[in-house]
Design a protein with these regions (language model features):
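Adenine-nucleotide phosphate-binding core of ATP-dependent small-molecule kinases
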Residues: 233, 242-285
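A short acidic Gly-Thr/Ser loop motif
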Residues: 14-21, 82-84, 191, 196-203, ...
Length: 285
């Protein structure tokens, strides 16, 4: 279940990917966030396939190792599903509805926008504010996913001895993170269009935010794994050896010119292509 608007005591932020699990624990004092604990642990091979958790115990064990390495104290966790596993839709609701009536009305209408049987779906909603389309209506963000996507993450977190309090969507988690960085943005990010590139092991997500809201996102199959594989081919290393060399160094002197620079060029072209797709989509208008 998504829990956009509810407040909890500090949680562990958990990023579960095909290559690793990353964890962070923050505290808030005097209006400033402070990192209390963080860690990253490699994900066992084949425990996640195409963003689906297929080995709950292996993922849970990786999470447990990350918690131990970080020395994190909280036992409650926020996780997220990928954007392509979620359905999002802004719908309009009468402005004069009470909170309980609004929830009932969303429940009645949700099946119009969700192409799955409702008993197989987890969904939640958030009121965005007055609608620009109709003065008598509210814009309401409806978000849904197959329940199995939520349960997979809950089960892995439970296997690690933790409790999943929030199951979010990565794009909305990105929005929330960007809101914490406004002091580093021109004009505090207000009325600004900002691109964010989330560079992963096997895929990269290119997102565009306007006024700190995601208005465009594109995933493409390119990531650090390509660099690892090129190191393997060039120097005759195993996957494990190449991954270690990539992180710790010690590669021959021609690594920069022969391997790294061409990889960076490819990465730059991929990001540039995503920017062109965004401009052509009309989302920027």
């Amino acid at each position: 279940m998504f829990l956009f608007t509810r407040k909890y005591k500090p949680l562990l932020g958990l990023d579960i990917t095909t290559s690793s699990v990353k964890l962070i624990e923050l505290s808030l004092a005097g209006g400033q966030y402070r990192v209390e604990a963080y860690a990253a642990e490699p994900m066992p091979v084949n425990s996640i396939n195409e963003k689906q958790i297929v080995d709950t115990e292996a993922v849970g064990e990786a999470i447990r190792r990350a918690v131990k390495r970080a020395g994190a104290r909280s036992k409650e966790v926020a996780v997220a599903i990928s954007g392509d596993a979620a359905i999002t839709k802004v719908i309009q609701m009468p402005r004069n509805l009470r909170a309980a009536d609004l929830e009932a009305q969303v429940e009645l209408q949700a099946d119009q926008y969700i192409p799955f049987p409702m008993d197989e779906v987890s969904y939640d909603f958030e009121v965005l504010g007055p609608s620009e389309k109709d003065n008598d209506s509210l814009d309401v963000l409806l978000v849904a996913t197959r329940t199995e996507n939520v349960e997979q993450r809950q089960a892995a977190v439970t296997a690690a001895g933790l409790t999943a309090k929030i199951v979010d969507v990565e794009a909305f988690a990105l929005e929330n993170a960007c809101k914490l960085m406004t002091h580093q943005m021109p004009d505090g990010g207000i009325d600004r269009t900002i691109a964010v590139v989330d560079f992963g092991a096997s895929s990269t997500t290119f997102s565009v935010l306007r006024a700190l809201k995601v208005i465009y996102t594109r995933d493409f199959a390119f990531g650090g794994q390509q660099l690892t594989e090129e190191i393997m081919r060039t120097y005759g290393l195993s996957m494990e050896e190449a991954g270690r060399a990539k992180k710790e160094g010690g590669l021959p002197g021609n690594f920069q010119a022969e391997v790294l620079d061409p990889f960076i060029d490819d990465m730059t072209q991929q990001v540039s292509r995503s920017l062109q797709f965004y401009l052509a989509s009309g989302s920027g208008r």
